[in-house]
């Protein structure tokens, strides 16, 4: 397995197998992410609220934050809004009613599920006091939007100034792995003596069994290209290979169905950059092993220098140099935050494949 994963990391000739079906209850699907992955988790949750029961957003996540306007064929979003108001100049953010109306408009067009589905959701949102990448106000507004869209306040857990983990930098926070707690640097996994995976999963699923000391399940590499339009994964910000953690109790043929949790890395955290670090070191797999949760780790792709050389000057503003998930409309995707979005659609197709609802 190590040799096969190495081939996937470095783009070797080896091609991963197709993603398979597993004994997963389609009514027990949830999603989480950090940074750009938090924005994508939020987009998945709101676009597919009929099929996702809960979401966790770490250091990101405000629906439509980079959207300027809506037209008949999609949304008009700006990278300048993403790096400005959404990340670093929160005083320029719109009031929560703007984002609520945007959500209603997209639902009226049939581009996302009716927001009324969100009332049953359970939501975890986190921002660290030392985060120098994404403003805490953005995450705070994201939590407010969930409440405005009908999620009861008791079902929205917003962690910012309160312990544990309050002093975190821009990172997924763990109990015993990663950078110093207040760091804002790769791998963007910080040791704050706080098991974020535990609280996130408990917020969504309720009480859990204690985690495994050493997960006994397996990591499965799978082919992501089949989920991209025309199998053009790289052109749409997707790596050729994604990963899945399968607990021993969730192998095909298991008598009892498991749950599915989708985890989305942030910028500079894909397997291109961190190898297996993100999908093995956040603490999620330990909890998944003992609580019958299959974990899907889709992978984003960073635009390479070679790919840049073939693009015109104006298109450079829509490139993805750090392997981020698409929350500002890069690659010309004007439906990036809806069910028709390339990445949202690809990830949802992966979910349907795992749960046996799709081909």
Map each language-model feature to its residues.
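Gly/Ser-rich "nucleophile elbow"/oxyanion-hole loop immediately N-terminal to the catalytic nucleophile
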Residues: 16-36, 46, 51, 112-120, ...
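Cap/lid segment of the alpha/beta-hydrolase catalytic domain
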Residues: 19, 68-70, 79-82, 176-178, ...
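Primarily recognizes the serine-hydrolase "nucleophile elbow" in alpha/beta-hydrolase
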Residues: 26-76, 209, 359
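Active-site glycine-rich loops that stabilize anionic/oxyanionic intermediates
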Residues: 35, 265-270
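The feature captures the conserved acid-bearing segment of alpha/beta-hydrolase catalytic domains
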Residues: 65-147, 200, 251-253
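N-terminal cap/lid segment of alpha/beta-hydrolase-fold proteins
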Residues: 89-106, 207-254
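Catalytic histidine neighborhood in serine/cysteine hydrolases
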Residues: 149-176
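Short beta-strand element of the alpha/beta-hydrolase
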Residues: 256-266
